[in-house]
Amino acid sequence: IDFSSIDVSFISLTKVLLPVKNLLTDDGQIVCLIKPQFEAGREKVGKHGVVRDKAVHEEVIQMVIDYAISIGFEILNLEFSPVKGPEGNIEYLLHLQKHTEGTYENIPFEIKNIVDKAHETL
């Protein structure tokens, strides 16, 4: 498989990234939707399952990125989704590429800037 997209609910991306990675070709890519409401702990999720705190958004994005790097992905890009989730959650698109030489920690963007722009725009 050269490319996969991942959009999961009620489960963390950290539970599905490795199995999907194992199906990819050596330079295969993934675009996955980071949904803060399913990555953050219950204590960080507000009314109606909405996460409004920018710091929590930054935290869960960093957690998913750290995990992706730890299992051998290169981080290509991060953008916020122009469409909010059904309850109003801001979500993020993370573009990954399988990195055959191990981990690759060059992250070409600032998470905080993307989260700030998402909250200003949406």
Enumerate the predicted regions with their spans:
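A short acidic, Gly/Pro-enriched loop at the edge of an enzyme's catalytic core
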Residues: 1-3, 15
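Glycine-rich, N-terminal phosphate-binding loop of Rossmann-like dinucleotide-binding domains
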Residues: 8-9, 34
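A short glycine-rich, Lys/Arg-flanked "PGG" loop and its adjoining helix->strand segment in the class I
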Residues: 14-31
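Residue-level signal for inorganic ion chemistry
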Residues: 35, 88
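Short, glycine-/aromatic-enriched active-site segment of Class I SAM-dependent methyltransferases
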Residues: 36-53
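Conserved S-adenosyl-L-methionine
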Residues: 72-82
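Flexible, glycine-/basic-rich loop-and-beta segments that form/coincide
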Residues: 89-122
